[in-house]
Curated annotation (Swiss-Prot):
Disulfide bonds: none annotated. Transports viral genome to neighboring plant cells directly through plasmosdesmata, without any budding. The movement protein allows efficient cell to cell propagation, by bypassing the host cell wall barrier. Forms a ribonucleoprotein complex with viral RNA. Binds microtubules and modulates microtubule stability. Can bind double-stranded DNA. The lineage of its organism: Viruses, Riboviria, Orthornavirae, Kitrinoviricota, Alsuviricetes. The gene is MP. Belongs to the tobamovirus movement protein family. One of its GO terms (biological process) is transport of virus in host, cell to cell. It comes from Odontoglossum ringspot virus (isolate Japan). One of its GO terms (molecular function) is RNA binding. This is Movement protein. It comes from the Viruses. Keywords: Host cell junction, Host cytoplasm, Host cytoskeleton, RNA-binding, Transport, Viral movement protein. The keyword Oxidoreductase does not apply. Pfam families: MP (PF01107). GO terms for cellular component: host cell cytoplasm; host cell plasmodesma; host cytoskeleton. It is found in: Host cytoplasm, Host cytoskeleton; Host cell junction, Host plasmodesma.
Amino acid sequence: MGRLRFVVLLSIFPIKTFSEPCSTMALVLRDSIKISEFINLSASEKLLPSALTAVKSVRISKVDKIISYENDTLSDIDLLKGVKLVENGYVCLAGLVVTGEWNLPDNCKGGVSICLVDKRMKRANEATLGSYHTSACKKRFTFKIIPNYSVTTADALKGIWQVMTNIRGVEMEKGFCPLSLEFVSICVVYLNNIKLGLREKILNVTEGGPTELTEAVVDEFVEKVPMAARLKSFRSVNKKKPSNSSKFVNGKSRLNSRNKLNYENGDSDVGISVVDDIVVGNGVSDIRIDDDCESFDAQSDSY
């Protein structure tokens, strides 16, 4: 009876097999990652599957590895390995977990400095996303970096991240590996970059709720955007500047092409002089606005 029950349990809970080989350290590293240490998830984001989270999706990359053979190396690293990205969208590198292991005997001297680099940035201080220092006597170490910034999917596919290792004081023959590093990243992928803005505020407005969808909602959002204030200041300065479309050149009135042609042909009945947008015809008592002049001087009232 006991054997029969044991067989039934095995059929209900089959043993899971892994389709691709991976090291023990990689398994331990992936199982030790807690997304809550890097980002705060709402209750719906924790419970709903990724297909129902339209705005963003949290994903963990596969393990990528670097083997250091030299004292100073700058290596490309795939922090989005196995991560399904959104086409024409964005990816936020929320966090990075790094595990290293010294391939040395115990009580060896020396140490290493590890730095995560964004190779798009030209200034060294801006390209450095985080660094870590440890000694060789610490056989295995783990640390995390929280870059917490977003890039476009197109940029991310170009492999923009690197890892710089600087090993010092380790006496080893060339051609051997003193240090191994493994990386796992936590990413947030999403299609729209507007996560906390006007769109979300309007969508959250409900009938009878505390916020009404009025013009004040839009004005409140626009006032919080710094560029809106800069644009307002820029336009106010330009309005104070004198217009370049003056009717006088060197103190003389400027005739449009049609009136100039009539004047040169000696047609005095239709000769017209233009003074401050007021057109006066010879022998005509009324004041008219010339169509060509009006269309030439009209200023657009749209910004």
